[in-house]
Amino acid sequence: MAIPTKERGSRLTDADILSDLQMYKPVTDSDTRNVWAFWDKGLSNSPAWNQRNVISWVRRLSPKWTVRVLDLVEGSPNHVSQFIPREMLTDVFWNRTMTGPHVGQHSSDLIRLPLLYLYGGVWLDVGMLLFRSLDALCWNALEDPETPYEVAAFKVSMGPELSFLFNGFIAARRGSVCIKYWHEIFRTLWDGATSCAGMHSHPLLAHLPVYEPPSLNGKRPPFMYAQFADYLAQVFCLERLRHLVDSKTGWDGPKFFEEKVLLFDCVTEAYWAQRLTDWNGRKQYELLDLQRGEDGLDNARVKEAEALVQGVLSMSSTMKLSHGLVTAGREYLADIWDSPKNHDADIRPGTFAAYLREASETFEQTKELVPLRMPVIEKALLRAGVTEVVR
C-alpha cells in the first residue's frame, strides 16, 4: 500500500518547528483545537523520536490546531504554571518532590485533566504517532452541536465485563464536568502522597473490582497487580466516576458514559503493532529496522515487517509506543529507541521505521470508526459524593 501524498503548503524544517514549539502561545476564548503534551525537562531534552512525533503532529495538524508541549523547566515559556493555577495541583507536583520509577508519567497524569477542563482540546502522550486527523477521529463529533458528545477516548478491554479508558489519548470539550470531577478524584489521591505506591487501595478506589490484565500466552502477567493498579491510578479514578451517582451534584456516571463519551477500541486504534508482535518490543525494533527495498520482499523477515507496517496503517488511527511498567524480561520499543545509539532509528533511510514516520505526516486513515460502549460493572456502582469515602 503506497502512502498517499497530501498537499501541505510550505514545509518548515524540523528545527524551525521545534523552535516554534518552545514559544509561549496563549489560549484565547475562541481556541478549541488545542493539542496538549508534556515533557518535564522540556521537549528539546526528550528523546529524538519523541521530538519528531510532535513535529509530525504540527505538520499534520497545522494550521487548524495549536500544539503545546508543557514542561517544568525553570523560566520556560511553556512551564506548567503558565497554564494551570497552583491550587489545581498538589505541592508534591510544584515542589518536584514526587518519588518512584514513574515520576515523569505521573506528573503528566496530574496536568492533563486540568488542561482539558480549562481549555479543551486533545491530550496526546509524546509517544504517539498520528495516522488520522484529529478532526476526523473525534473532534468533528465533539464540536457538532447536534451530537451529545463531550469526551472522546480509547477503551481498553480487560475481558467481556471489565474495561477502562486509556489516558494517553483524551479529547474533551472545554469545561466538561466529567474531566473536572475526574481530576478532583485523582488530585485527592495525591493529597499527602509523594508516590503512587498503594493508590490502588485508597479508600476512594477500594470498592472497585480487580482489573486483572488478560493473558496473551496462557501465562500470568509479569508484574504484581498492585504495581499495575498503582501505575494506572488515574484511570481507576475514572472508573470510580463512571460508576458513581451523586445526588447532590446531579452527576450520573453510567448515564454520562452511555450518552456523552465517544469510545473506540484502544488496541485497534493505538496498539496494533504490539498485538501483531505479541507485545515484543525487541521484535518490533528488529522488523522496523529492516530495509524496505522491493528486492528484499522475497525475504521472509522482510515480508513480516511489511505485514506489520501495512497491518498498522490499514487498522489504526494512531500508534502508541509506551514505556510501561518496569518489568523484568520485558523490552519496550520506546526504551530501545530512547537509547542514544538509536537516536535516528525512526528515520534511518529506507527502513520500515522511516516509512511509518513518513506515514505519520502524509497518510490519512479513512477506515470507518465504530463507536463502542463500556459495560457497567454492577458491583462497582456507588451512590456518594465525588470524593466522599463510603465505608
Swiss-Prot record:
An annotated Gene Ontology molecular function: glycosyltransferase activity
Regulation: Activity is significantly decreased by addition of divalent cations such as Mg(2+), Mn(2+), Zn(2+), Ca(2+), Co(2+), Cu(2+), and Ni(2+); while Fe(2+) has little effect.
Reported consequences of knocking out the gene: Failed to produce fumihopaside A, but leads to the accumulation of the aglycone intermediate.
Protein name listed in UniProt: Glycosyltransferase afumC
Superkingdom of the source species: Eukaryota
pH dependency: Optimum pH is 8.0.
Database matches in Pfam families: Caps_synth
Record has Glycosyltransferase as a keyword: yes
InterPro entries: AfumC-like_glycosyl_Trfase, Nucleotide-diphossugar_trans
Pathway(s) the chain acts in: Secondary metabolite biosynthesis
EC number in record: 2.4.1.-
